[in-house]
Amino acid sequence: MPVRVHNFLGKLGWNARKYLPWLASESYLKLQFVTRRKLQRNYIEYFMSAKEVPQPLVVNLETINRCNSTCEFCTANKYAEKRPYMRMEDELFYQIIDQLSEWGYKGHLTMYGNNEPLLDTRIVEFHKYAREKLPEAFIFMSTNGLLLTVEKVKEIIPYVDQLVINNYCMDMKLHKNIQKIYKYILEHPEEFKDVDVLIQMRYLKEVLTNRAGSAPNKPATDKVIKETCLMPYTDMWIMPNGKLGICCCDNFEVTDLADLHEVSL
């Protein structure tokens, strides 16, 4: 099927996230810890035994650091944003993609971070270039869908393997523009045979993690979580200013690992 609509645990899950947010949040975290432990052990063994440092599983390439949504769990929502405005230079973007191409990169690539990628007017052209240079990479776009139209979807799908539309709402209903897109895809499946379109029903006021103490709707805690986080080893996090960050939860971009103006990937 060219389009799927996913709502975690259906109406039961939605009501839990809406009416029992802290319980839902903590339960989800515990589930993640349980399901990921074996995968983490396997990855650590793989990473430590590799003759060369493995390529990242995911490259997150944020080209603009702004969002147009109001998700209460995120510091990038338009009412909570504190970061200085940044937009990646064209030259730097193309250099990064060229370096990934020289690397023979075949992992996942997304031009998404703590932002809405469609706010960058160059985003379709950027995806086109990435597709040409990285034919074996899995390129996906994650968007809140607020700026999406049928025409915009048709522009982007030739260059992505997956389009993820996060439908953030209060009523468990698709936004009107997303309804039109969903209907169009169902009526024209042949146009979408080479792309996976996933629409995720998301609660706008959901409580997730505390994002290393920065989440607007979940304060920091002194509780020590004795779990391993592998994101600095599995994900490459590139910000619009060319800095390589430690991970997506460093929302205010406090920790820099490198500057891609000075070093290569």
Which role does the model predict for each range below?
Residues 2-10, 55-60, 213-265:
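Accessory C-terminal segments flanking Radical SAM cores
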Residues 2-162, 175:
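Conserved alpha-helical substructure of the radical SAM core
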Residues 66-68, 79-81, 116-117, 145-148, ...:
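Short, solvent-exposed loop/turn segments at secondary-structure junctions
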Residues 107, 115, 210-213, 258:
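Glycine-centered flexibility motif
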Residues 120-233, 239:
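Conserved AdoMet/S-adenosylmethionine-binding subsite of the radical SAM
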